[in-house]
Amino acid sequence: MAKAVVFFAEGTEECEALLVVDLLRRAKVEVLVASASGSREILSSHKVHITADALAEEVDYSDVDLVVLPGGIPGTPNLAANKTVTDTCVSFVKTGKKVAAICAAPSVLAALGLLEGKNATAHAAFQDKLAGAHVLDTEVVVDGNITTSYGLGGAIPFALELVRQLAGETEADRIRSAIAYRH
């Protein structure tokens, strides 16, 4: 069974984060919600209380296939400030494991030098922060083992792409139909 970790921090955009958790779990992917805020209790960008499964520092990433960075302010800078999050992203990219980021969060990957020479996207307000990347203004961009999306409006196609990567095209199509997503 594939395994994913979705990082949450104080101020994470809850819809982007929880949609990924939901659709991956529908696809029978094992998903761990990991807090990057030093507490399992997280307050999202729109004041939704979320309880993480574990702290990011407690997770064994050796059998994890994908890590996901949701956007949100101040969630994105809070993710960027967490050494476990940034070290894990660098390690995953260097070893060919999958990393995904949406909205403002691709800027974290760019700051780490992980988007150098890659195609990527981000929220329009953060596209200028994608140093070294070839920025595309589209919902979802996959370049090698890195997947990016431009924001909440692209969250469903982003999550479905992650389902496709971890559980296959048939499962992504099944979920697309089950949630009545017709785009």
Model regions and ranges:
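Short acidic-hydrophobic surface loop/beta-edge motif
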Residues: R40-S44, E139-V142
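A cross-family phosphate/adenosyl-ligand binding-site feature
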Residues: E41-D53
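Rossmann-fold NAD(P)-dependent oxidoreductase module
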Residues: L23
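Active-site-adjacent pocket-lining segments in enzyme domains
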Residues: K3-T12, R26-S35, D53-H183
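Short N-terminal binding/cap micro-motifs at the start of the first secondary-structure element
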Residues: T12-A17, E41
